[in-house]
């Protein structure tokens, strides 16, 4: 799943240099402060995010709109769908 919409996100999160579980904790905190329907673009370089961020979205009911995990930094675009 790839997209060029990362720059159009309502919010940006730089998780580069952070290691598990910090990136997902930062994503969760960011999403808590967002309105329904807003988007969050994430940049990360911890390989565990390739598993953890999609799992977080499924578990919490948010949409992983796009991801680019072919090379670092990994990028994700999430839409907040649940309060």
From Swiss-Prot:
Pfam families: TusA (PF01206). PROSITE patterns: UPF0033 (PS01148). It is found in: Cytoplasm. The keyword Magnesium does not apply. Sulfur carrier protein which probably makes part of a sulfur-relay system. The keyword Cytoplasm applies. GO terms for biological process: tRNA wobble position uridine thiolation. The active site is at residue 20. Keywords: Cytoplasm. This is Sulfur carrier protein TusA. One of its GO terms (cellular component) is cytoplasm. Belongs to the sulfur carrier protein TusA family. One of its GO terms (molecular function) is sulfur carrier activity. It comes from Pseudoalteromonas atlantica (strain T6c / ATCC BAA-1087).
């Amino acid at each position: 799943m790839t997209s060029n919409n990362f720059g159009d996100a309502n919010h940006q999160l730089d998780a580069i240099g952070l290691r598990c579980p910090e990136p997902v904790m930062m994503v969760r905190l960011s999403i808590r402060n967002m309105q329904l329907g807003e988007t969050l673009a994430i940049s990360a370089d911890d390989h565990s995010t390739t598993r953890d961020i999609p799992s977080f979205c499924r578990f919490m009911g948010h949409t992983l709109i796009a991801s680019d995990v072919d090379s670092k930094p990994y990028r994700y675009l999430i839409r907040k769908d649940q309060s």
